[in-house]
Regions:
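Short, structured coil segments at secondary-structure junctions
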Residues: 106, 173-174, 261
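Short, solvent-exposed loop/turn and secondary-structure capping segments
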Residues: 101-105, 167-170, 248-250
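A short, structured surface patch at a secondary-structure boundary
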Residues: 51, 56-149, 155-160
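Bacterial Sec-dependent N-terminal signal peptides
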Residues: 1-23
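Bacterial Sec-exported substrate-binding components of ABC uptake systems
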Residues: 17-98, 207-236
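Alpha-helical, coiled-coil/dimerization segments enriched in small aliphatic residues
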Residues: 246-269
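Extracytoplasmic substrate-binding proteins
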Residues: 133, 152-244, 268
Length: 269
Protein backbone atom coordinates (compact mmCIF):
# COMPACT_ATOMS: atom_id res chain seq x y z
CA UNK A 1 0.00 0.00 0.00
CA UNK A 2 2.99 2.25 0.47
CA UNK A 3 3.52 2.20 -3.30
CA UNK A 4 -0.05 3.41 -3.84
CA UNK A 5 0.42 6.37 -1.53
CA UNK A 6 3.75 7.32 -3.06
CA UNK A 7 2.46 7.22 -6.62
CA UNK A 8 -0.46 9.46 -5.68
CA UNK A 9 1.83 12.00 -4.03
CA UNK A 10 4.41 12.04 -6.80
CA UNK A 11 2.03 12.28 -9.75
CA UNK A 12 -1.15 13.89 -8.47
CA UNK A 13 0.93 16.79 -7.16
CA UNK A 14 1.96 17.51 -10.74
CA UNK A 15 -1.40 16.73 -12.31
CA UNK A 16 -3.21 18.64 -9.58
CA UNK A 17 -0.46 19.43 -12.10
CA UNK A 18 11.77 3.38 -20.01
CA UNK A 19 11.92 5.67 -23.14
CA UNK A 20 14.07 8.76 -23.00
CA UNK A 21 12.28 11.96 -23.96
CA UNK A 22 13.84 13.72 -26.94
CA UNK A 23 12.57 16.98 -28.35
CA UNK A 24 13.72 18.19 -31.74
CA UNK A 25 13.07 21.85 -32.44
CA UNK A 26 13.74 23.11 -35.96
CA UNK A 27 11.94 25.58 -38.17
CA UNK A 28 8.39 24.38 -38.77
CA UNK A 29 8.93 21.22 -36.74
CA UNK A 30 6.57 19.72 -34.20
CA UNK A 31 7.70 18.97 -30.68
CA UNK A 32 7.64 15.28 -29.94
CA UNK A 33 4.87 14.48 -27.47
CA UNK A 34 4.88 10.84 -26.45
CA UNK A 35 1.75 10.58 -24.34
CA UNK A 36 -0.50 13.63 -24.86
CA UNK A 37 -2.99 13.21 -27.71
CA UNK A 38 -5.03 16.40 -27.47
CA UNK A 39 -2.28 18.94 -28.11
CA UNK A 40 0.31 19.69 -30.79
CA UNK A 41 3.22 22.12 -30.53
CA UNK A 42 4.93 23.46 -33.64
CA UNK A 43 7.98 25.72 -33.58
CA UNK A 44 8.62 28.22 -36.35
CA UNK A 45 11.14 31.03 -36.66
CA UNK A 46 8.69 33.73 -35.56
CA UNK A 47 6.38 32.05 -33.06
CA UNK A 48 5.19 28.76 -31.57
CA UNK A 49 1.84 27.37 -32.66
CA UNK A 50 -0.04 25.35 -30.04
CA UNK A 51 -3.18 23.57 -31.21
CA UNK A 52 -5.58 22.06 -28.71
CA UNK A 53 -7.80 19.33 -30.10
CA UNK A 54 -11.42 19.28 -28.98
CA UNK A 55 -11.76 16.22 -26.72
CA UNK A 56 -15.56 16.37 -27.01
CA UNK A 57 -15.75 16.61 -30.81
CA UNK A 58 -13.40 14.38 -32.75
CA UNK A 59 -11.59 16.03 -35.62
CA UNK A 60 -12.18 19.60 -34.48
CA UNK A 61 -9.98 22.17 -32.77
CA UNK A 62 -10.72 23.51 -29.32
CA UNK A 63 -8.30 26.44 -29.53
CA UNK A 64 -5.18 27.56 -31.39
CA UNK A 65 -2.54 29.74 -29.74
CA UNK A 66 0.34 31.64 -31.27
CA UNK A 67 3.06 32.25 -28.70
CA UNK A 68 5.11 35.33 -29.53
CA UNK A 69 8.19 36.38 -27.58
CA UNK A 70 7.79 39.50 -25.49
CA UNK A 71 9.35 42.54 -27.13
CA UNK A 72 8.75 41.38 -30.71
CA UNK A 73 6.05 42.53 -33.12
CA UNK A 74 5.37 39.34 -35.04
CA UNK A 75 2.17 39.06 -37.07
CA UNK A 76 0.23 35.84 -36.55
CA UNK A 77 -2.69 34.21 -38.40
CA UNK A 78 -6.13 35.42 -37.38
CA UNK A 79 -7.50 31.93 -36.74
CA UNK A 80 -6.19 31.76 -33.19
CA UNK A 81 -5.19 33.71 -30.11
CA UNK A 82 -1.92 35.62 -29.85
CA UNK A 83 -0.20 35.20 -26.49
CA UNK A 84 2.86 37.23 -25.54
CA UNK A 85 5.33 35.08 -23.60
CA UNK A 86 6.74 34.65 -21.08
CA UNK A 87 3.66 35.48 -19.05
CA UNK A 88 4.46 37.96 -16.31
CA UNK A 89 1.02 38.41 -14.75
CA UNK A 90 -1.46 35.55 -15.00
CA UNK A 91 -4.72 34.64 -13.32
CA UNK A 92 -5.04 30.93 -12.55
CA UNK A 93 -8.36 29.25 -11.80
CA UNK A 94 -7.15 25.83 -10.61
CA UNK A 95 -4.90 24.60 -7.82
CA UNK A 96 -3.30 22.08 -10.20
CA UNK A 97 -1.94 24.72 -12.53
CA UNK A 98 -0.99 27.20 -9.82
CA UNK A 99 1.03 24.46 -8.15
CA UNK A 100 2.69 23.54 -11.44
CA UNK A 101 3.67 27.17 -12.10
CA UNK A 102 5.33 27.20 -8.69
CA UNK A 103 7.18 23.98 -9.49
CA UNK A 104 8.38 25.55 -12.74
CA UNK A 105 9.91 28.31 -10.62
CA UNK A 106 7.64 31.08 -11.90
CA UNK A 107 5.62 31.91 -8.75
CA UNK A 108 5.83 35.68 -9.31
CA UNK A 109 3.87 35.25 -12.53
CA UNK A 110 0.79 34.36 -10.46
CA UNK A 111 -1.02 37.68 -10.03
CA UNK A 112 -4.46 36.34 -9.18
CA UNK A 113 -6.32 33.10 -8.48
CA UNK A 114 -9.89 31.88 -8.28
CA UNK A 115 -11.30 29.90 -5.34
CA UNK A 116 -8.47 31.04 -3.07
CA UNK A 117 -9.95 29.29 -0.02
CA UNK A 118 -9.50 25.92 -1.73
CA UNK A 119 -6.00 26.62 -3.05
CA UNK A 120 -3.92 24.98 -0.34
CA UNK A 121 -0.53 26.13 -1.59
CA UNK A 122 1.50 27.76 1.21
CA UNK A 123 3.21 30.38 -0.96
CA UNK A 124 -0.05 31.37 -2.66
CA UNK A 125 -1.88 31.69 0.66
CA UNK A 126 0.97 33.69 2.16
CA UNK A 127 1.18 36.12 -0.75
CA UNK A 128 -2.61 36.44 -0.95
CA UNK A 129 -2.69 37.80 2.60
CA UNK A 130 0.06 40.30 1.93
CA UNK A 131 -0.59 43.84 0.71
CA UNK A 132 0.00 44.03 -3.01
CA UNK A 133 0.18 40.25 -3.28
CA UNK A 134 -1.92 37.67 -5.09
CA UNK A 135 -5.50 38.82 -5.66
CA UNK A 136 -8.52 36.63 -4.91
CA UNK A 137 -10.61 36.81 -8.09
CA UNK A 138 -13.64 35.09 -6.59
CA UNK A 139 -15.43 31.89 -7.53
CA UNK A 140 -14.16 30.15 -10.67
CA UNK A 141 -17.74 29.68 -11.84
CA UNK A 142 -18.54 33.35 -11.27
CA UNK A 143 -15.26 35.31 -11.19
CA UNK A 144 -14.91 38.95 -10.21
CA UNK A 145 -14.41 40.50 -13.66
CA UNK A 146 -13.50 43.94 -12.32
CA UNK A 147 -10.67 42.55 -10.20
CA UNK A 148 -9.31 40.61 -13.15
CA UNK A 149 -9.38 43.70 -15.36
CA UNK A 150 -7.59 45.74 -12.68
CA UNK A 151 -4.80 43.15 -12.57
CA UNK A 152 -3.90 43.81 -16.23
CA UNK A 153 -3.22 40.12 -16.63
CA UNK A 154 -1.36 38.67 -19.64
CA UNK A 155 -3.57 35.56 -19.66
CA UNK A 156 -6.14 33.58 -17.70
CA UNK A 157 -5.66 29.84 -17.19
CA UNK A 158 -8.94 27.96 -16.73
CA UNK A 159 -10.53 24.58 -17.34
CA UNK A 160 -13.00 24.15 -20.22
CA UNK A 161 -16.08 21.98 -19.88
CA UNK A 162 -18.30 20.31 -22.44
CA UNK A 163 -21.45 22.29 -23.30
CA UNK A 164 -20.51 25.02 -20.82
CA UNK A 165 -21.87 27.76 -23.05
CA UNK A 166 -18.59 29.69 -23.08
CA UNK A 167 -16.99 31.97 -20.53
CA UNK A 168 -19.39 34.89 -20.48
CA UNK A 169 -17.82 38.29 -19.82
CA UNK A 170 -14.34 36.78 -19.58
CA UNK A 171 -14.42 36.46 -23.37
CA UNK A 172 -15.11 40.18 -23.74
CA UNK A 173 -12.28 41.77 -21.73
CA UNK A 174 -9.46 41.20 -24.20
CA UNK A 175 -7.33 38.88 -22.07
CA UNK A 176 -6.21 35.58 -23.69
CA UNK A 177 -7.99 32.58 -22.21
CA UNK A 178 -5.77 29.51 -21.92
CA UNK A 179 -8.07 26.48 -21.99
CA UNK A 180 -6.39 23.88 -19.79
CA UNK A 181 -8.00 20.74 -21.19
CA UNK A 182 -5.19 18.49 -19.97
CA UNK A 183 -7.59 16.67 -17.66
CA UNK A 184 -9.30 15.17 -20.72
CA UNK A 185 -6.21 13.16 -21.66
CA UNK A 186 -6.67 9.41 -21.29
CA UNK A 187 -3.49 8.73 -19.34
CA UNK A 188 -1.79 10.28 -16.34
CA UNK A 189 1.44 10.82 -18.27
CA UNK A 190 -0.52 12.32 -21.16
CA UNK A 191 -2.00 14.85 -18.80
CA UNK A 192 1.35 15.54 -17.16
CA UNK A 193 3.01 16.10 -20.54
CA UNK A 194 0.94 19.27 -21.00
CA UNK A 195 3.44 20.89 -18.63
CA UNK A 196 5.59 21.39 -21.73
CA UNK A 197 2.93 23.77 -23.05
CA UNK A 198 2.74 25.59 -19.73
CA UNK A 199 6.53 25.76 -19.65
CA UNK A 200 6.45 27.61 -22.98
CA UNK A 201 3.86 30.04 -21.61
CA UNK A 202 6.04 30.98 -18.65
CA UNK A 203 9.42 30.91 -20.35
CA UNK A 204 10.31 27.72 -18.49
CA UNK A 205 10.62 25.29 -21.37
CA UNK A 206 13.77 23.58 -20.12
CA UNK A 207 12.46 23.36 -16.56
CA UNK A 208 9.26 21.75 -17.85
CA UNK A 209 11.18 19.21 -19.93
CA UNK A 210 13.38 18.29 -16.97
CA UNK A 211 10.43 18.05 -14.59
CA UNK A 212 8.47 15.86 -16.97
CA UNK A 213 11.42 13.49 -17.39
CA UNK A 214 11.53 13.04 -13.61
CA UNK A 215 7.76 12.49 -13.43
CA UNK A 216 7.86 9.99 -16.28
CA UNK A 217 10.65 7.95 -14.71
CA UNK A 218 9.11 7.98 -11.23
CA UNK A 219 5.64 7.15 -12.52
CA UNK A 220 6.82 4.14 -14.50
CA UNK A 221 8.95 2.88 -11.64
CA UNK A 222 6.23 3.25 -9.03
CA UNK A 223 3.56 1.83 -11.31
CA UNK A 224 5.71 -1.26 -11.82
CA UNK A 225 6.18 -1.61 -8.06
CA UNK A 226 2.45 -1.22 -7.48
CA UNK A 227 1.64 -3.92 -10.05
CA UNK A 228 3.57 -6.45 -7.94
CA UNK A 229 1.93 -5.45 -4.68
CA UNK A 230 -0.20 -8.09 -2.97
CA UNK A 231 -2.26 -5.40 -1.28
CA UNK A 232 -5.00 -3.44 -3.04
CA UNK A 233 -7.35 -0.78 -1.73
CA UNK A 234 -10.73 0.40 -2.93
CA UNK A 235 -10.73 3.99 -4.15
CA UNK A 236 -13.67 6.40 -4.08
CA UNK A 237 -12.87 10.02 -4.96
CA UNK A 238 -14.79 12.84 -3.34
CA UNK A 239 -15.52 15.97 -5.34
CA UNK A 240 -18.92 17.34 -4.46
CA UNK A 241 -19.97 20.69 -5.91
CA UNK A 242 -23.36 21.85 -4.71
CA UNK A 243 -25.78 18.97 -5.18
CA UNK A 244 -23.57 17.21 -7.73
CA UNK A 245 -20.94 14.61 -6.95
CA UNK A 246 -18.36 14.39 -9.73
CA UNK A 247 -16.64 11.06 -10.35
CA UNK A 248 -13.94 10.46 -12.98
CA UNK A 249 -14.61 7.83 -15.64
CA UNK A 250 -12.65 4.61 -15.57
CA UNK A 251 -10.82 5.49 -18.80
CA UNK A 252 -10.03 9.07 -17.73
CA UNK A 253 -6.53 10.13 -16.71
CA UNK A 254 -7.52 9.88 -13.04
CA UNK A 255 -9.33 6.56 -13.49
CA UNK A 256 -6.28 5.06 -15.19
CA UNK A 257 -4.06 6.53 -12.48
CA UNK A 258 -5.99 4.49 -9.92
CA UNK A 259 -5.48 1.41 -12.09
CA UNK A 260 -1.73 2.02 -12.42
CA UNK A 261 -1.55 2.49 -8.65
CA UNK A 262 -3.11 -0.99 -8.25
CA UNK A 263 -6.28 0.42 -6.73
CA UNK A 264 -9.81 -0.94 -7.12
CA UNK A 265 -12.05 1.79 -8.50
CA UNK A 266 -15.79 1.14 -8.33
CA UNK A 267 -16.44 3.01 -11.60
CA UNK A 268 -13.51 1.60 -13.57
CA UNK A 269 -15.90 0.27 -16.21
Amino acid sequence: MRQLIVIFLSVLTLLSCGNTHKQQVVKGSQSELQYAHNITIEHTKDYVTVRLLNPWKEGSTLHTYYLVKRGTQENVPDDGTKVVVPLQRSVIFTTAHANLVEMLKAPRAIAGVADLRYMIIPDVQRRAHRKGGIVDCGDAMKPDIERIIDLRADAILLSPFENSGGYGRLEQIGIPLIECADYMETSALGRAEWMKFYGLLYGKEHEADSLFTIVEQNYKSLSKQASHSKITRSVLPDRKVGAVWYLPGGESSIGLLYKDAHGRYAYSN
